[in-house]
Amino acid sequence: MTFIVDGHLTFDNLLPFLANWYDRRAIVNSIILACAVGFAGTIIGFIFAFAVTRLSLPKWLTFFISAVTLLPLISPPFTSSIALTLCLGPNGIILTALGLENFNFFGFWGTFISETLTYFPIAFMTLSTILMRIDPNLEDAAYSLGASPFNVFKSVTFPLSVPGLANAFLLVFSCSLADFATPLVLGG
């Protein structure tokens, strides 16, 4: 399929593809999955980034959380789907141990869980940088004016991290949309 025919831009080759209901449904499902993974991955990444950058944790725990969070980036995306299949598949280790026989891990939810676990480290890295760059004096000023920790988060930290949240969402969304192997393995 090409958009350039005889030197001119045309969408004529795209129309038969979009006329097929099955192809349109695949596009819609991919966008829905990518939005869900982007949203969930950004939330989880923000929680981990906030814990590492803003909470008073021991250095070893901060290092451990950061290292474990980045592990999914080391392996290809399909390895997490294979690992989750071994754990949560029909004869999976966890389902067998829990005695759950009718649990179906394949389909949308299995793909969603696998991609979220695979791609949330991207949001973690993006948001860790954003949260580290927020000037602590702004939060200290809010505390000195009598704001509670929740109000400081709500009125200072969160608004300043919104551009990073948008960036993290777009990165996780695009990675999920581009992933072919995970839906192939877990799509059902």
Regions found by a protein language model. Give the residues of each.
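The DNA-contacting recognition helix of HTH DNA-binding domains
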Residues: 124, 149-150
